[in-house]
Amino acid sequence: VTPLPTRRRLASGKVRDLYEAGDDHLLIVASDRISAFEQVFPTSVPGKGRVLTAMSVFWFRELADVLPNHFVTCDGPLIPESVRGRALLVERLDMLPVEAVVRGYLTGRGYSDYRRSGAVCGLPLPPGLAESARLPEPIFTPSTKARRGDKDENIDFGTCVSVLGRALAEEVREASLELYRRGAVRAAEQGLLLADTKFEFGIGADGGLVLADELLTPDSARYWLADGHQPGVPQPSFDKQHVRDWLVDPASGWDCVSPLPPLPPEVVTATRDRYVEAYQRITGLSLADWPRDPADLRQPASRLGQCGGTGDRRDPHRDQDVHRPRRSAALQPR
């Protein structure tokens, strides 16, 4: 846990710690912790928290025209110096109880579902697709938000509608698909494929939908090199797959039941290098320069009214068939 004596800690996830920052805002601190199979390793990956924060800030600013997001700043007096570079001041939201997953390629749990049923989250796909194959169109495959230690469960869109209401579920789906498309275009320009990603959303003070949590980071998105992409086999990715591969190798000594063992130095270094490379490829910036110009550490002025919850956007769901989430104390960190 990241110690901040002057802040009240609200929650801790596998990677992030959440603190109070007044009535309308929260402070999210990304640690260097790394997890696998719903456990946290005793070994951290130096600089990982900075990568997650820097990459989220880049994407929050890059995609702010698609949908308002909760990011306010990662600079200024509300950011303690001890966590500067890996902390975000964000708007407090009513979080939706559904994760929005978009898949552009057939991999991971999506591929497992397809092999078993020919569909992913109730969406039928063409027969004969290989692992890592590009899908005809990106698909929206929501999931539940599991408690810590449990696994998220894929759900179909009908179940998503029953949880959120039709109007809100459709808005979440359309926003998620557009965010994915925009992210995939940027990734392609940098020689990467955005295989899949997850988004989280909440409801702001004005009743509108707001993008939350992290955005298109190596922890929440699967990036592959476009060069050498080969359907039919798993692809090397810019995330913690290297850690998982080491862990399931018999040489690690892990029995799938005991607490996770320490990571070898070479695995830590290789993992850090993949995270840093993902950031530098996507942004064209050096992580060594983060945090940089204060003007790049805040939401653009034109967006602050919306992202701070004080804008005058009309609630798109008012008087429509929508289920409001119960008032939650905080975003639950992962």
Positions of PLM-derived features:
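Active-site loop/lid in soluble adenylation, ligation, and acyl-transfer enzymes
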Residues: V1-A146, W254-P262, E266-G311
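Catalytic cores of nucleic-acid ligases and guanylyltransferases
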Residues: S31, R182, L209-P218
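Short, active-site-adjacent segments that bind or coordinate small-molecule cofactors and metal centers
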Residues: E91-L93, E189-T197, G202-G204, R272
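Conserved metal-phosphate-binding beta-hairpin within the catalytic cores
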Residues: V102, L194-L215
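A short mid-domain helix/strand-loop element embedded in enzyme catalytic domains
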Residues: R134-R166
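A long amphipathic alpha-helix within ATP-dependent nucleotide-binding catalytic cores
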Residues: L164-A195
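C-terminal helix-cap and adjacent tail motif
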Residues: L215-A278, I282
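N-terminal low-complexity segments that are often proline-rich with Ser/Thr-Pro
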Residues: Q306, T310-R334
